[in-house]
Curated annotation (Swiss-Prot):
Entry domain remark: The His-rich loop facilitates the closure of the zinc binding site and is required for zinc acquisition.
Source taxonomy: Bacteria, Bacillati, Bacillota, Bacilli, Lactobacillales
Residue sites binding Zn(2+) per the record: 66, 152, 216, 291
One Pfam family linked to the record: ZinT
Annotated organism of origin: Streptococcus pyogenes serotype M18 (strain MGAS8232)
Name of the featured protein: Zinc-binding protein AdcA
A molecular-function term among this protein's GO annotations: zinc ion binding
SUPFAM superfamilies per UniProt: Helical backbone' metal receptor, Lipocalins
Swiss-Prot/TrEMBL keywords: Ion transport, Metal-binding, Signal, Transport, Zinc, Zinc transport
Keyword Ion transport: yes
Family membership noted in the UniProt record: Belongs to the bacterial solute-binding protein 9 family.
Region (Disordered): 125-148
Length: 515
């Protein structure tokens, strides 16, 4: 009897031990295993996940995110994860290849920027912004790294809120049973971001100096969202002493504008700092791009918020001191694309430059797809125009009921599609006309005339695509009418605009935002 009782007790003990093991396993399995790319993504994701998951980071401190390439081990980590979160394809350029290589369909892939439009980055040749309602343009570039679009959105607290919201929404959709916790965690984290945003706004909205000079042009969104101007300089790094020639030119530049600080992405070596101070009369300071924190720094309590507040404190060394407006060392705005060229540079073009199937952007203006563009333009104008005013202006410019145009360069035909009805005409080249705009920049209209006597309103057409010589167009503004070419030359307010028919509305919005 005793043996039976002991056997029963043993079985019960084993059963409870097994139950406990199972419970622990279920608890562990209930946690979402998330792999992130680099520090800001890790930080934001942890803010959303809380205690409902295990969040890891591929790139350790000291790794350059722009140059990172995942190892086979890294790819396996992603493969074995429940979710993979990254910032943007313009930052982690390798992600598209990794997506294709994944064999597991269970991995939820989250893009931090979501549908956020980005501004132009280095490598994007056609950057312009409309500064005066007559297509004034401005080129943007970033020192050191080559991006079609600038991915450094996390350096603006205002935009970081959107990144956290995107991560929250994607993970909540993938794990509905945890959505309530994710939303609560995100709400707490976003409140902290809103406080940081308020601190930046309060400190910088009335800045005495609106421009700051940096060696690492990663702070474009921060500058845009808080009313500042980021001035990027070349030929200066935190660990290599500038050449004598560079010191000489930098010294002149610093003295011309009374520049007191040049910002680096990390502490400049003592030798570089001393050289800058002695030879150029300027101090070196650090604005962290927040691409990584060491374990030691994190254990010491440093995080996104402490570093961003330190950045603000350092930035105020410049913004709190009144001074003259600081301009870039070189004026990069007067390019051909922006409307500055010599007459002899203008060459004849053929209709084949515009061959293809093209769609009007007007429907995307109407359905709100382009709304982010107007917000960006309003901020770039620094109070000159509101987002609503920009939308009204472009509504007039883009408005058309010709939703599609098909151009056959070989046959020299243009097919206009209106409400599904097609009209095709054959065109001959009629020359070019250089127009001068009120701001002093210029544009070229390339003119064509229909052979058919019944072409009506499509008798005369003029292309404008910011190019002045033969090249394949990426988009264009088109003017048409039945009276004369001369009458069309006077049309400056209405310029129906067309992009490739293979592009989505968001892709078109992104291209427009980079112009």
């Amino acid at each position: 009897m005793k043996k039976k009782i002991l056997l029963m007790m043993s079985l019960i003990s084993v059963f409870f031990a097994w139950q406990l093991t199972q419970a622990k396993q279920v608890l562990a399995e209930g946690k979402v295993k998330v792999v992130t790319t680099f520090y800001p993504v890790y930080e934001f994701t942890k803010g959303v996940i809380g205690n409902d998951g295990d969040v890891s980071m591929l790139m350790k401190a000291g790794t350059e995110p722009h140059d990172f390439e995942p190892s086979t081990k890294d790819i396996k980590k992603i493969q074995d994860a429940d979710a993979f979160v990254y910032m943007d394809d313009n930052m982690e350029t390798w992600v598209s290849d990794v997506k294709k290589s994944l064999t597991s369909k269970k991995v939820t892939i989250v893009k931090g920027t979501g549908n956020m439009l980005l501004v132009a980055g280095a490598g994007h040749d056609h950057h312009h912004e409309d500064a005066d309602k007559k297509h004034e343009h401005n080129k943007h570039s970033e020192e050191g790294h080559n991006h079609a679009f600038d991915p450094h959105v996390w350096l603006s607290p205002y935009r970081s809120i959107t990144v956290v919201e995107n991560i929250r929404d994607s993970l909540s959709k993938a794990y509905p049973e945890k959505a309530e916790n994710f939303k609560a965690n995100a709400a707490t984290y976003i409140e902290k971001l809103k406080e940081l945003d308020k601190d930046y706004t309060a400190a910088l909205s009335d800045a005495k100096q609106k421009s700051f000079v940096t060696q690492h042009a990663a702070f474009g969104y921060m500058a845009l969202d808080y009313g500042l101007n980021q001035i990027s300089i070349n030929g200066v790094t935190p660990d290599a002493e500038p050449s004598a020639k560079r010191i000489a030119t930098l010294s002149k530049y610093v003295k011309k504008y009374g520049i007191k600080y040049i910002y680096f992405e990390e502490n400049a070596s003592s030798k570089v700092a001393k050289t800058l101070a002695k030879e150029a009369g300027v101090k070196a300071a650090v604005l962290s791009p927040l691409e990584g924190l060491t374990k030691k720094e994190m254990k010491a309590g440093q995080d996104y918020f402490t570093v961003m507040r330190k950045n603000l404190e350092t930035l105020r060394l410049t913004t709190d001191v009144a001074g003259k407006e600081i301009l870039p060392e070189k004026d990069t705005t007067k390019t051909v694309y922006n409307g500055y060229f010599k007459d002899k540079e203008v060459k004849d073009r053929q209709l084949s430059d515009w061959s293809g199937s093209w769609q009007s952007v007007y429907p995307y203006l109407q359905d709100g797809t382009l709304d982010q563009v107007w917000d960006y333009k309003a901020k770039k104008s620094k109070g000159k125009m509101t987002a609503a005013e920009y939308k009204d202006y472009y509504t007039t410019g883009y408005k058309t009921d010709v939703e599609q145009i098909k151009i056959n360069g070989k046959k020299k035909t243009m097919t206009f599609v209106r409400n599904g009805e097609k009209k095709t005409f054959t065109y001959t080249y009629a020359g070019k006309e250089i127009l001068t705009y009120p701001k002093g920049n210029r544009g070229v209209r390339f003119m064509f005339e229909a052979k058919e006597p019944n072409a009506g309103e499509f008798k005369y057409v003029q292309f404008s695509d910011h190019a002045i010589a033969p090249e394949k167009a990426e988009h264009f503004h088109l003017y048409w009418g039945g009276d004369s070419q001369e009458k069309l030359h006077k049309e400056l307010e209405h310029w129906p605009t067309y992009y490739g028919s293979d592009l989505s509305g968001r892709e078109i919005a992104q291209e427009i935002n980079a112009h």
